[in-house]
Amino acid sequence: MAVIEIAMPTTPNFMRSDFRLHRAVGQTVSPFTGKQKTQEYDYVGWSAQVTLPPMRRAVAANWQSWLTRLKGSSNFFQFADPDALTNLGTYDTAYLEAVPRVSVASTTLTFATDNTILDDGTIFADAVVGDYIFITGANDTENNGTHKISVVNANNKVTVTSTLAAENNDSNCKVQQNVKGATGLSLKASTNTAAGSIAVGDYLGVLTSNSATSVPKQLLLVTEVSTQTAVSGGKNLISVGTEPKLRADITSGHFVKFTSPKGIFRLTDNIVEW
């Protein structure tokens, strides 16, 4: 049987809501030293518990229909944090475009304790201050993960806000943006005139295509105010820190929704009642 989206009724609004973020994190504690070691796994996801107000039967019928058509956890619906339906930022268009400015599948990097990353090529030629890069393949795990660029020193060198471990000529490193595991987005404005900020606490919806009406594939919370680099006669470049980590790569050119972003949700129980 095909899985389909069932549109949620829009009224009345919920009288109470609790919004939660779930992670899969393993932890071990040494019985001898008390030292802890954690391992974060791929799973991340939102959940919500909501309460509707009392309503007359004519209105409640719409919700009953919706609940039954979901068929337990079989079908899905679009949903967002009921207490944050309008973003606080001033960005003045409905969506942004995903565009990686750094994307290298294999390169040699040198990491220094002054928090600089040196490449043996020119991979940072298009990077801008505020960009988030995602590194994998470094021998020292401290150097892997998402790093925010604070200075573009040269086409082959950047300074990041993270604390790095010293490593020389670390080969087979990947330096990418908008990929699975990253906690930051590399974007550009949707038009040459679009501008404005994306605020901490705003939500963004990663969409499945370059259409503003396409189905979302992940809902993200903004954790650092956006950085915007003006482009004369072109689309401004925008960088923003987000959580949770991306569950999948974002295709270049696909849209990230700013106005009324939503995620995909399912019922947690196969029993519905009223």
Q: Which sequence ranges carry the predicted segments?
A:
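Extracellular structured ligand-interaction cores
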Residues: 45-47, 201, 217-220
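Residue-level signal for secondary-structure boundary sites
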Residues: 56-60, 85, 230
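Oligomerization/assembly interface segments of phage tail-like spikes and tubes
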Residues: 37-58, 269, 274
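Long, polar/Ser/Thr-enriched low-complexity segments
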Residues: 12-49
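Extended, solvent-exposed, turn-rich assembly/linker loops in the middle of proteins
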Residues: 185-189, 197-207
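Small/polar beta-strand repeat architecture
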Residues: 3-11, 18-19, 89, 94-129, ...
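A glycine-rich, hydrophobic loop/mini-helix early in the fold
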Residues: 64-100, 178-182
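Glycine-rich, often proline-containing surface loops adjacent to acidic residues and nearby aromatics
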Residues: 43-49, 179-186
